[in-house]
Amino acid sequence: MRSGLGVNRRGFLNLGAAGVAGAALASMAPSKSFAASGNYEAMLVNCIDPRFTTLSWQYMGLIQGVSRDKLEDNYSHFVMAGGPIGAVHPKFASWHDTYWDNLDVTVSLHKIKRVIGISHRDCGAAKLAFGADAVSDKDKETAAHSESLAMFRQEVNKRHPKLSVITGIMNTNGRVDLIG
């Protein structure tokens, strides 16, 4: 027998079972709930490179003076090629407004206290921005990243002078060399 919705009795029972299973799974999820606006800790901007997603999350639990519990579900995350390099380097000028508009929104909604800009070693976007020679060894790479990270800090400070800014270069093992 079909219902007016085109579902037979067995299909209807399967839909009901799926709904019960979904409700059961939802009830097992952590009950932590936050408002869309409020007082949150930070905004992290970093690169799209999949090698650094877990390492970046782990780093966020190690920031001096901020416990992992304080950061869990308590920071905005903006990901773009090159991370903070993508937000300021002329090679990626068409992306700049998107990042700065997002920062404005998270400042307005989330009342963040700091911005954390992390670039990383062996970054393809950095190579595109700076040229292969500028990142051909660790010293050159550090100098190129440092220049963009300084520009990033200056731009954040100009737009939002009350925010603190942490910048660094993440190594492929997850260690971050703080810059600035």
Task: Tell what function each PLM region has.
Residues R2-V7, A35-E41, D49-T54, D97, ...:
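Catalytic cores of secreted/periplasmic or lumenal enzymes
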Residues L15-V20, F34-A93, M170-V176:
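Short, conserved "active-site rim" segments that organize catalytic pockets and cofactor/ligand binding
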Residues G22-A24:
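Bacterial N-terminal signal peptides
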Residues D69-E141, H145:
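Short HxH-centered metal-ligating active-site micro-motif
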Residues M1-V20:
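N-terminal secretory signal peptides and thylakoid transit peptides that target proteins
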